[in-house]
């Protein structure tokens, strides 16, 4: 890892952010992290903690405080408003799109070595089959689903515009479904796993995605920082999988019975009831029309580019899922006595 750089990680307590931050800290790097919650910082970071700046991605004044010293800086921008539905459109746009623009704006007059924008495979235009080199990935917001997908696409547009108009040394890092230890935020798939273990998930659906281990990105982070080319896009993923496959690995480890699998049309029939339940309880729904659409998408993403340029290798999904469950137990997010 290049220790001559000062690393700035926005969203350093988030799922992706904390895993990458811990990797940098383990390598002895100088890391400055943007966070909003002191309580979460204490929960996420134990022995090693980055220099924390408490602030909001929507405030340029807060973001200016991240640039301590003269650099050179490597910015790893992970902040986004994550939602499996359309979400609060204003907050989605303000955090994910304008927040990215704010980070770009405050970086333009700094000594930036690399600006890594952590994006998502959800930003890929509907129906687009990526080339091996991702040269045909052109963010097209109106060809993505409204909500998180579209917001990430707009954010990608802002980054590429900054590359074109201001020579920002930025690259797009698209991530498929993130799994593995480190999810202190109870993201959607983690909640599905917890509900299954706790007996609150009555059935699975006949669909899948592409889930990979975020630790495998951390392992090649040094090569990403040094070798990612300005203006280019990279995708980290594994192979397409099924929800049943993930849950069966969970079940094998926790001695839980396999769930029945519902056809997709039944899942769609249940949407109004989930929406009503969400409104009554204030809890997020188990799934939405947007998340069901993702389960039907082609997720056979090309990995040749990251394998060749960064030495990336996706570990077996079963190993990732088991380690994910172990993490939940160790952090008391599930009760091990549920299955031991």
Walk through the language-model features, giving the residues of each.
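Glycine/proline-rich active-site loop of Rossmann-fold NAD(P)-dependent oxidoreductases
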Residues: 166-168, 180-191, 224-234, 256-257
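Conserved Rossmann-fold NAD(P)-dependent oxidoreductase catalytic core, especially the SDR/UDP-sugar
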Residues: 98-147
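NAD(P)H-binding glycine-rich loop region in Rossmannoid oxidoreductase-like domains
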Residues: 46, 51-98, 106
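Substrate-positioning beta->alpha
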Residues: 188, 205-225, 232
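N-terminal Rossmann NAD(P)H-binding glycine-rich loop of SDR-like oxidoreductase domains
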Residues: 6-27
